[in-house]
Amino acid sequence: MTKPLGMNSSFNVARPDFALIAAWVKPGSKVLDLGCGDGSLIRFLRDSRGARGYGVEIDDANVLACFNNGVNVIQSDLESGLQSFESGSFDYVVLSQTLQAVKNTENIIKEMLRVSKEGIVSFPNFGYWKNRLQVLSGHMPVSEALPYQWFDTPNIHNCTLGDFEEFCGQHGAHILERRVMSGNHQIRFMPNLLGMLAFYRFEQQK
């Protein structure tokens, strides 16, 4: 979920994770971004992959920013916004750094796979070693990926890589590809301990 734009702000510079997501999107694909913020990801996919993009966003300021920047957006809560789409409407549905704030995780993943061929999610890895140290010291983690204090955080379902992969196995989601990052570096060794952000591409179990 990207940050809101002010009325006089220029369009957000693409986040480093956008390039990773774009690498998984085939040129010319139809993409839906849930909780799209100001539409930065959709615009990046349109410009870099020729994607036909749409967003779902509830915040008034972000919806206006999407319109001002030529991004198609539907104003709706992301957890109910998928109900208006027919099955197989998209090639990809993206949930970028928002999974941990979703109330009904099971339903959102199910709906993502109903309306698209593939789902793409990214989320902060709660098993990251710095998070573990903060918990060990008696505090909830606060970091670049988890910037909120315990009392004002929207994050209600933090998880680790192992948690998400177990969830997928139990809910009919077949993982096609995984990338784990710390800053701009891909983590291959002990990713559940050393990785800050996790990215998954998945499809309905066949």
Predicted regions located by residue number:
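Class I SAM-dependent methyltransferase Rossmann-like catalytic core
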Residues: 2-14
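A short SAM/SAH-binding and catalytic strip from SAM-dependent methyltransferases
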Residues: 92-103
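Glycine-rich SAM-binding Motif I of class I
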Residues: 39-43
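Class I SAM-dependent methyltransferase SAM/SAH-binding core
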Residues: 44-81
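S-adenosyl-L-methionine-dependent methyltransferase catalytic module, highlighting the catalytic core
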Residues: 106-111, 118-206
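Class I SAM-dependent methyltransferase "Motif I" SAM/SAH-binding loop
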Residues: 35-37
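Short conserved loop adjoining the S-adenosyl-L-methionine
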Residues: 81-87
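Conserved alpha-helix/loop element of class I SAM-dependent methyltransferases that forms part
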Residues: 12-28
